[in-house]
Amino acid sequence: MSKQAQFNKHRVAGLLVAMGVVYGDIGTSPLYVMKAIITGQGGMQAVDEKFMLGAVSLVFWTMTLLTTVKYVLIALNADNHGEGGIFSLFALVRHRARWLVIPAMIGGAALLADGALTPAVTVTTAIEGLRDVPAYVQLFGASQNTIILITLGIITLLFMLQRFGTNTIGKLFGPIMLGWFTFLGVSGFVNLVQDWTILRALNPYYAWLLLISPANKVGILILGSVFLATTGAEALYSDLGHVGKTNIRLSWPYVKVCLLLSYFGQAAWILGPGQAIQGHVNPFFAMLPASLTMAAVIFATLAAIIASQSLISGSFTLVSEAIRLKLFPRLLTTYPGKAVGQMYLPVVNWGLWGVTSMLVIFFQTSERMEAAYGLAITLTMLMTTTLIYAFLRQKRLPLIGAGLLTGFFATIEVIFLIASAAKFWHGGYVAVGLALLIFLVMAVWYRGEQIVRQHNHPLSLRQYQDQLAKLRDDQTVDKFQTNVVFLTSRMDGDQVERKVLYSILDKWPKRADVYWFVNVTITDEPYTAEYTVDTLATDYLVTVKLYLGFRVRQDINRYLRTIVRDLMATGRLAAQKQTYSVTSGRDVGDFRFVIIEEKLENGSRLSRLDRLVIETKLMIKKYATTPAKWFGLEFSEVTLETVPILFNEIPALPITERQR
C-alpha cells in the first residue's frame, strides 16, 4: 500500500472516529430544538411563515457564530499538547493569574451537571417517537409511563456497561453516526425541496425581526430554546484529544450541512400545506413518512445512546483532570479498555446514573426536560471564553484584539444566559443546583489544599542528615524495612514536609537502609512521564520527583521499580543482595510505603471559615479512594499513620498541679 493510500485510510478512519466521538450531543439536537421552539410559541397553530423564518435564522447563525467560529475555528487552536476542554485550557494558562481557577471550576461544574441532563433529554425524546408508530400505540397505548420505563431501562443498561469499556462497540459509533447525519440530511432535504423559500432564513435580518416582533410571544427568551442547537459545541472542544483538530475541522462541514438540512426541512414541513395540526408535535418525526417512523425511532435511540456515551466518557475525563489538578478529591479509577485515556470512575458513573434516572422520573416528558436544559452549559461556554482570553494574551495577541474577539462572544453568551435564566423556575434549578454542589466540592478542596500549604513549613533533609545516618546504624532500634518510601505532596530540593521527618524521628523511629522521599508533580502537558533523582551525596537518602501529565495514571510502585533499576545500573544505588527469595539473583531489597493521613486538632489556630473548610474537606475525603489505591500500592507493604494537620501550631493547654 502506498504512503498516500495509507494516509487516506487513516484519514477516513479518523473522520469516522470524529463522527462517533465528537458530534453525539450536537447531532441529536434536531430531535428537540424545533419542537422546543414551537412549543414555546404555543404549538403548531401559533406559528406562521415569519416566525419560522426567524426561528431557523436564529438556529443557523447561532451554530455559525458559536459552534463554527468560536469552537471549530478559534477554540481548537487553544489545545494543551493536543488536549482540549476547559480543564486542559486552564492547565495551559493557570500561571497567568490565580483567579483563573474560578472560571475553570464554574465551567467544569456546569459541564458535569449538563452531563447528567443530556442522556435524560436525548433518550426520552427518541423513545417518545414511538407515539408516532401505530403498532406501538395499539400494543401499549399512549401512556407516558411506558416511555419512562423504556427510557430508564436503556439508561440503566448504558451505565452498567461502562465498567467493561467500549472498545468493541465503540468501533460502531462512527459508522452509526455517519448514517445518522446522512439520514438527517436526506430527510430534511426531501422536505426542503417542497419549499425552497425557507432558505431566506440565511439572511440574519429575519433573526433580528423575530426578536423584536410582537408576534414572538416569549421575546428574547426564545433564545433559550434556540441555544439547544449548539449545546454540544463544548463537548466538541472537550473531545479534541481523542480525534485531533484536523479531523474535527474536516468532518464538521458535512455534519453542519446535515444538521441545517434537518432544521430547514422541519421548518419547510411546518409551513407546508395541510400542517394545521393542533397542540404539540415533534416535527422531526412528524415530517417523516409513516413507514419510516419506526426505523427513525431506532436510529434516533442509537444516536441518543452514542451521545450519552460521549457525555459519560467526557465526565470521566473531566473529573480525572480535576483530580490531577487538585480541584477534586481522589476517586477510584480503573482502566477497562485498551485505548489511551479510556477510564472508568465508579462513583461518577453511578452518581450520574442516579441523577439522570431521577431527572427522567421527576420531569416525566422531554418537553419539561427541554425547558430546563441548556442553562448550565451557557455558564460553561462563558467561562471557556474567559479562559480563551487568557490564552490569546499568552500568545501575545494585543489587548484590544483579544478583548474585542472574546468580548464579542461573551456578549452573545451573556444574552443566551439571560434568555436561559427563565428556565430556572421551569426545572433549570436542578442543573444549577447540581453545578453549584459540584463547584462547592471543588472550591472546598482547592481552598483546603491552599490552607495546608500555607501553614505547613518544610524542613531540610540535610539539616537532619546526621540524625538519619545515626538512626540507620543504630542496632538498638528494630529495623523497620530495607527501603522505606514516604510520599510527600511538597518537595523542593532537599526540603520535604515536616510531617515526614516527624514520622521517621519522633512518632516511631524507623530504621532503614535507604530512605526514599517521593513527590508527584502534575505537569500542564497531558502525557508526561519523567523523573529527577538526587541522592544528596549519600547512599541512604534518595529524593525522587515524578513529573506526570494530568492524564497519566499515578502508579507509583511501578515507576519506582524502573527508577531503582536505573540507579543501580548507573552505580548511584548499591545492590541489596537478598539471602531469601523465590526470584533468582534478586538484588533489590524489600520496600514499605508510609502514607501519612492528616487530622484536624481542636487546638489548631485557624479562623472559623478556614476551620470549616478543612473540616468539610476531611469529611469529603472519607468518601474518596484511599491513597494506597490511588498510587497503585494495593499489593505493596503500606503503613498508615496519622498526624495533626497543623501540628506545629497547636498551643499547649495550661494546667496546674493540685497541691495535696
Curated annotation (Swiss-Prot):
Keywords: Cell membrane, Ion transport, Membrane, Potassium, Potassium transport, Symport, Transmembrane, Transmembrane helix, Transport. The keyword Lipid metabolism does not apply. It is found in: Cell membrane. InterPro entries: K+_transporter, K_trans_C, K_trans_N, Kup. The keyword Phosphoprotein does not apply. The chain crosses the membrane at residues 14-34, 56-76, 99-119, 139-159, 173-193, 208-228, 257-277, 286-306, 343-363, 372-392, 399-419, 424-444. GO terms for molecular function: potassium ion transmembrane transporter activity; symporter activity. It comes from the Bacteria. It catalyses: K(+)(in) + H(+)(in) = K(+)(out) + H(+)(out). HAMAP family: Kup (MF_01522). Belongs to the HAK/KUP transporter (TC 2.A.72) family. Transport of potassium into the cell. Likely operates as a K(+):H(+) symporter. This is Probable potassium transport system protein Kup 1. It comes from Lactiplantibacillus plantarum (strain ATCC BAA-793 / NCIMB 8826 / WCFS1). The gene is kup1.
